[in-house]
Amino acid sequence: MNGVETVEHNGTKYAEIIWAGTTVTETRFFSPAGSSFQFGLLAHEAGFVEPPHYHKPITRTIEDLQQMFVVQRGVVAVEFFDEHGKLFREVVLHPGDGIVLIHGTHAVRVIEDMQCISVKQGPFLGAENDKINVEVNTN
């Protein structure tokens, strides 16, 4: 698959997926400008130089915790569940595929031994503060 795909259900955006074969001719961010987590593809022609810089320290208020991971090796399934705990979608990711988990209940199932680059907002407050385990319908 190519391109960027959004996983939505009942008005909730669960995830954005960027498939490994996706290419752009210039830098492009896919997340809405107001999103607390920005992701995109950087693309420049040979010889491009970004001037030396640093990022301004600005206080930001973030109420949601989003996570992105990019599969380096292996195969991973991400399952999405509705507000009643019912599975409504499964996405299978291969090396080079990336996903941003935005809202809603999800589970990760490793199909083949995997390694992923994972990025999420900090600071880390401990699993007991960052995660809520949910009972789901397995029927």
Each language-model region and where it sits:
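Double-stranded beta-helix
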Residues: R109-N139
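Short acidic-glycine-tyrosine-enriched beta hairpin
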Residues: D82-H103
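A short, N-terminal "cap"/entry segment at the start of jelly-roll beta-barrel domains
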Residues: M1-A43, V136
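A short, compositionally biased micro-patch
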Residues: E45, V71, H94, L101-I102, ...
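Glycine- and acidic-residue-biased ligand/ion/polar-headgroup-sensing regions
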Residues: E45-A46, D64-E79
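Conserved short histidine dyad/triad with adjacent acidic residue
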Residues: T23, L41-E63
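Short beta-strand His + acidic residue motifs that chelate non-heme Fe in jelly-roll/DSBH
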Residues: P52, V78-E79, I99-L101, T105-I111, ...
